[in-house]
Amino acid sequence: MRYDYFHYTERDRKFYEEHLKDRMPREFIDAHTHINLPEHIADVPGERIRDDWALQNGMHMTAEDAAYYYDTLFPDQKWSLTAFPYPIREVHMEANNDYVSRCADTGEIAYGLMCIKPEYSVEYLEQELTEKNFSGVKPYPDMVSGKKGADIGIFQFMPHSHLALVEKMGLPVVMHLPRAGRMPDDAN
């Protein structure tokens, strides 16, 4: 489902040619892309979307749609994606993770990260990371709180056992820090 508001115009092309084309690297990787299918986000309440500017700016994007957008916006560049589900509690996470893994299998994305929930057992997590095409994990505070900047600690949404497993497997963790102060917060 491409967004109705996305229209690439002659003005856009001209701006790209005059201001961006020669400044852009020939190859780049977007290391933070959310992909999903409509059924993965069907249960996200409308009020949740209205209360969060990020959710209002495009909750749904398939890997195919992402390719269309990137090809349109960056016609002279070779691009690749690191992608993962939208990491909020109401998403059908297991199905969305499967979709991300399949997209990595087919080469639609370069790297897929598994969005993890704190309640996942270490055994389940290890099985998924071993048997499916995931290059790392994406824990997120929303899996505990449902609120941005919530006053929770890192190990509430990424238990020590999960961290130990991904360290053992040598996998990266892409993490948004919790708490309103983010990086400078002493509890982080």
Model-predicted segments: where are they?
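Solvent-exposed, non-transmembrane amphipathic alpha-helical segments
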Residues: R48-L55, S101, Y120, G149, ...
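Well-ordered, non-membrane alpha-helical segments in soluble/globular domains
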Residues: L55-Y70, M93-R102, F155-H160, D185-N188
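An N-terminally biased module of ancient metal coordination in phosphate/nucleic-acid-related enzymes
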Residues: M1-Y86, V91-H92, T130
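Histidine/acidic-residue-rich catalytic or RNA/ligand-binding cores of hydrolases
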Residues: E39-A42, P184-N188
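Active-site gating/metal-coordination segments in enzymes
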Residues: R2-D12, S80, I88-G181
